[in-house]
């Protein structure tokens, strides 16, 4: 420790010369040397020089493997820093701690949890390397959240092994490390500043915002990462601005023109690779912004099971789209944290890509599922090469100098790309109400399912009134869904969703016909059983029959008497015929079955009513597609309203007719029994 103190004093005296700040000190109770801690935080470039200098000194003094730990929060620049070292010293071996994830320990998809790391395997590999043995390093696939294989790692010629990861300076690894390096700042801090700016711009109070950001955006940083970083001997502050990526931009040419796979292969060299990708781009709207005009989205990407945050700062130089291509991995919980701070999911874009890649250029065939479109993309760092490749593919003259989100905004298609991926819903437990309904048809089905489920539940309990109340609530919910998606429907009348809608309508009608046939056969069977009774009905039942046949009796008049398939609180007189009917148990079962069947028919009629209303609205929208002035739109709207009214008539008439038949048959039987 005395030497350590002397080293620190020496460092303070020679503050101006970086190479003199990197000093060795012998470890206590060990023959190995380590680096004296540098108290000042170094810039990215100075830190790189210091680490290279430290590795050189350590390899001169220490025998065997030199273990270097590089740790820091997500987005701080660990991977970039490690790659920079690898480019300078190609003989260095790098071990990523991500490959030591144990999928059985994942909790809520949180890959930042320190308990996730399989330290037993990692420590065994490090000990074997120290002994000069060949090791099998696991390969972890984030898409399947599983270990898919192993790669062989020999002791590198330089004897330097870098361990890179969030917890590379953890207590379990520190005793083995010869050099401890921390990297902080970078996009990690840029995100915090960006979130702070968005929240303040929305008029929120700044008190405790920083604390809230730390707790919600990076919940693991303060608790587990930051304490370990304090033990680093070389501390690097990455002041990297993500938008300095324009110094090495990616040039993109985009087109709707279709090009075959064979054409692409013919243009690219024989050494190209071919892969397929599936990505979800989640565009996060800052507080107070309009989704159709926002130019400052945060974009979170789900690809191969990993989540990354992308800073958007697009520049167009027609026909090129120029992108900084700055991304960094984040925890799956980041989305929930940002939403807790006031961000909302504006758009979710699912993209399936067929990628053809060479060393210098990428050609992609993108399929945007929600928009039902193909796009061609040619990307690369060399502007001239990108342009010549696009021209060879025959894309010249068809370029679209806009990003996908800009194209969506231009065409007012924000609501059409709101399909929330299942894995996000499962891992984040996001409520559907946090985003717009993915489809008005799905909203209709959800409302119908809720309505049918509630009715079945209330049938068992005999709660006809509560069913009516709940139905009104569900209808209001349905109206809310329809209102929020009206613009979507008007734009999407030719979309594949309509095919599914018509198929569903046909299935509902078919099911209704089957139940009507069953109901008719039941009534005929019951009539045959009642034909032996010849007693005439009383005046009261005649008057009731007249009301029912004329349709003047309210629906609740006979529904209230059919709860649970029995005739409680019914319009029947309390006479001896009631007790006789109760004693006739087989016939009572028949009547109960018919009552339940009647209610099931009403279920189908309810669903059919709503589906026909949607179909009528579709027809009215198609009819007014060609209209170009507000007057025509007003008349179409009125026509649509009248169509909706007309579409309700048939289900209402059928409902009243079926209920009338049921009550007439039951009353006839009772009166005859009298």
From Swiss-Prot:
Could you mention a single GO BP entry for this protein?
Answer: negative regulation of systemic acquired resistance
Q: Which PROSITE patterns match?
A: CYTH
EC main group: hydrolase
Record-listed E.C. numbers: 3.6.1.1
Please give the start and end residues of each transmembrane region: 650-670
Q: Which UniProt keywords apply?
A: Hydrolase, Hypersensitive response, Membrane, Mitochondrion, Mitochondrion outer membrane, Plant defense, Transmembrane, Transmembrane helix
Compositional bias per record (Low complexity), positions renumbered to this chain = 623-640
Which residue ranges does the record annotate as region Disordered?
457-498, 619-640
Cofactor(s) needed by this chain: Mg(2+)
What turns on expression? Answer: Repressed by the oomycete pathogen H.arabidopsidis. Negatively regulated by salicylic acid (SA), benzothiadiazole (BTH) and pathogen-associated molecular patterns (PAMP, e.g. flg22).
Any one GO molecular function term: pyrophosphatase activity
GO cellular component, as recorded: mitochondrial outer membrane
Lineage, top-rank taxon, reads Eukaryota
Q: Does the keyword Transmembrane helix apply?
A: yes
InterPro entries linked to this entry? CYTH-like_dom_sf, CYTH_domain, P-loop_NTPase, PRK/URK
- Where along the chain is composition biased (Basic and acidic residues)? 484-496
Task: Report the locations given in the UniProt record.
Answer: Mitochondrion outer membrane
* Membrane topology (UniProt): Single-pass membrane protein
Q: Which Pfam families does this UniProt record tie to the protein?
A: CYTH, PRK
Q: Which reaction does it catalyse?
A: diphosphate + H2O = 2 phosphate + H(+)
Q: What does this protein do?
A: Exhibits pyrophosphatase activity with stronger affinity for pyrophosphate (PPi), moderate affinity for ATP and ADP, and weak affinity for tripolyphosphate (PPPi). No activity observed toward uridine substrate. Negative regulator of the salicylic acid (SA)-mediated amplification of defense responses against both virulent and avirulent pathogens, including oomycetes (e.g. H.arabidopsidis) and bacteria (e.g. P.syringae). Represses systemic acquired resistance (SAR).
Protein name according to UniProt: Inorganic pyrophosphatase TTM2
From the broadest rank down, the organism's phylogenetic lineage runs: Eukaryota, Viridiplantae, Streptophyta, Embryophyta, Tracheophyta
Which gene codes for it?
TTM2
């Amino acid at each position: 420790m005395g030497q350590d103190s002397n080293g620190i004093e020496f460092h303070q005296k020679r503050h101006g010369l970086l190479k003199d700040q990197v000093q060795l000190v012998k470890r206590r109770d060990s023959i190995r040397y380590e680096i004296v801690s540098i108290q000042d935080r170094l810039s990215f470039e100075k830190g790189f020089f210091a680490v290279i200098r430290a590795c050189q000194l350590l390899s001169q003094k220490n025998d065997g493997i030199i273990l270097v730990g590089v740790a820091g929060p997500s987005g701080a620049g660990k991977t970039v820093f490690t790659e920079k070292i690898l480019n300078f010293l190609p003989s260095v071996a790098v071990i990523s701690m991500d490959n030591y994830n144990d999928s059985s320990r994942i909790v809520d998809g949180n890959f930042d949890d320190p308990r996730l790391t399989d330290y037993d395997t990692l420590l065994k590999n490090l000990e074997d390397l120290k002994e000069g043995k060949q090791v099998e390093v696991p390969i972890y696939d984030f898409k399947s959240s599983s270990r898919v294989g192993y790669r062989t790692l020999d002791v590198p010629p330089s004897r330097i092994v870098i361990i890179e990861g969030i917890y590379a300076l953890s207590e379990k690894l520190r005793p083995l490390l010869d050099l401890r390096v921390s990297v902080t700042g970078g996009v990690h801090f840029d995100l915090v500043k960006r979130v702070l700016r968005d929240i303040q711009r929305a008029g929120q109070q700044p008190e405790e915002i920083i604390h809230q950001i730390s707790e919600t955006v990076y919940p693991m940083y303060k608790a587990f990462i930051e304490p370990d970083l304090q033990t680093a001997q070389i501390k690097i502050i990455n002041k990297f601005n993500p938008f300095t990526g324009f110094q090495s931009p990616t040039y993109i040419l985009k087109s709707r023109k279709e090009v075959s796979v064979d054409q692409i292969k013919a243009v690219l060299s024989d050494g190209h690779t071919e892969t397929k990708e599936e990505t979800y781009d989640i565009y996060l709207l800052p507080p107070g912004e309009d989704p159709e005009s926002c130019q400052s989205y945060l974009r979170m990407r789900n690809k191969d099971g990993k989540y990354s945050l992308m800073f958007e700062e697009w520049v167009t130089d027609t026909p090129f789209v120029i992108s900084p291509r700055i991304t960094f991995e984040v925890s799956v919980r980041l989305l929930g944290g940002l939403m807790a701070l006031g961000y909302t999911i504006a758009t979710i874009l699912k993209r399936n890509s067929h990628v053809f890649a060479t060393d210098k250029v990428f050609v992609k065939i993108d399929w945007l599922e929600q928009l039902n479109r193909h796009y061609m993309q040619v990307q690369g760092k060399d502007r001239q090469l990108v342009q010549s490749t696009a021209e060879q593919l025959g894309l010249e003259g068809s370029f679209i100098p806009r990003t996908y989100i800009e194209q969506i905004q231009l065409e007012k298609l924000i609501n059409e790309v709101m399909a929330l991926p299942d894995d996000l819903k499962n891992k984040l437990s996001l409520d559907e109400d946090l985003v717009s309904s993915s489809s008005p048809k799905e909203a209709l089905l959800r409302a119908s399912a809720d309505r049918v489920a509630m009715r079945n539940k209330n049938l068992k309990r005999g709660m006809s009134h509560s069913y009516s109340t709940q139905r009104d609530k569900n209808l209001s919910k349905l109206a809310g869904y329809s209102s929020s998606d009206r613009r979507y429907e008007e734009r999407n009348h030719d979309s594949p969703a309509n095919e599914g809608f018509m198929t569903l309508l046909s299935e509902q009608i078919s099911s209704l016909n089957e139940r009507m046939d069953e109901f008719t056969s039941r009534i005929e069977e019951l009539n045959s059983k009642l034909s032996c009774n010849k007693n005439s009905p009383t005046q009261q039942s005649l008057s009731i029959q007249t009301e029912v046949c004329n349709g003047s009796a309210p629906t609740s008049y006979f529904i209230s008497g059919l709860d649970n398939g029995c005739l409680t609180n019914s319009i029947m007189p309390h006479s001896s015929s009631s007790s006789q009917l109760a004693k006739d148990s087989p016939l009572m079962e028949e009547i109960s079955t018919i009552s339940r069947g009647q209610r099931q028919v009403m279920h189908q009629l309810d669903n059919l009513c709503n589906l026909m209303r949607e179909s009528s609205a579709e027809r009215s929208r198609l009819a007014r597609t060609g209209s170009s002035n507000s007057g025509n739109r007003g008349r179409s709207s009125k026509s649509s309203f009248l169509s909706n009214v007309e579409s309700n008539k048939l289900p209402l008439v059928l409902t009243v007719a079926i209920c009338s038949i049921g009550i007439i048959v039951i009353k006839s039987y009772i009166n005859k029994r009298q």
